[in-house]
Amino acid sequence: KKAYDGHYAIGAFNVNNMEIIQGIMAAAKEKQSPVILQASEGARNYAGQEYIVGLIKIALQDYPEIPTALHLDHGSSFEICKACIDGGFTSVMYDGSKHSFEENVRITKEVVAYAHDKGVVVEAELGRLAGVEDLVSVDAKDAIFTDPDQAAEFVELTGCDSLAIAIGTSHGAYKYSGEPYLDYERLEKVGQLLPDYPIVLHGASTVIPEFVEKCNQFGGKVLGAKGVPEEMLRKAARMAVCKINIDTDIRLAMTAAIRESIFKNPENFDPRGYLKPAREAVRQMVRHKIEAVVGSANTI
């Protein structure tokens, strides 16, 4: 509500390990910003749900002044959402966008009923983003922009607390083959039909050229990567978008720093030697996103 009224968004950053969490929280403290730490099913498979929740609980103890949510990103079933709700997540996303409208409504309602009974909020998705990221993969030909009228009906039928819509972003590092595009008219229409309601943008990494170039400079092959320009995301945040998801930029920032460190220090075999600059790269990148993209600096 505060973000909607203030015409800014809150950054939702995907986490997989300790260094990412530490970097994000340090940046949030510096910029005095709320933050959403989100774990995908892939992160749960990689680190284990108990480890992810445990690390974030420690972060909450270290940064009690920072409003922080622990969110499930792209939960693919009621069972996954239930496990996360029971395991300590404060927010979950059920992604039923691959299903028919009716089936998406049915399962989302089940998740909402269970979550709300436990004091947990629910994000849902209507429309399909193209791209590949983690366990989510959608061909461009199967991408579907969100219908504003259906969005309003969906929220009314399900009672979900926020809605991820498709207006031109996509998952992964290769978002556009042509010029970047966001359908602001569609977003505005959704906002008119759902006043004072938080909209979510997935696939919103900028794919920062500095990190792409550094990855390639030090042995990587990240070729043809293109993201969403920052000014386009900022405009969306001034409209109805209250949550902006960022994953790929974290991956690129960390990988660029690790590649550079290993290249410049070939004698080092201590993981801390390259994970420390990776953590610092995350901190700097998140600081920039908070201030220049989502606009949530100094809102606590």
Predicted regions and their residues:
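Alpha-helical and His/Cys-centered functional microenvironments
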Residues: T206
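Generic long, charged, amphipathic alpha-helical segments
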Residues: V200-G203
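N-terminal amphipathic alpha-helix/helix-capping segment at the start of soluble metabolic enzymes
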Residues: K1-G11
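Alpha/beta enzyme core
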Residues: K1-K2, N17-A43, E50-E65, H74-P198, ...
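C-terminal alpha-helical cap/extension of soluble enzyme domains
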Residues: Q217, V222, V228-I300
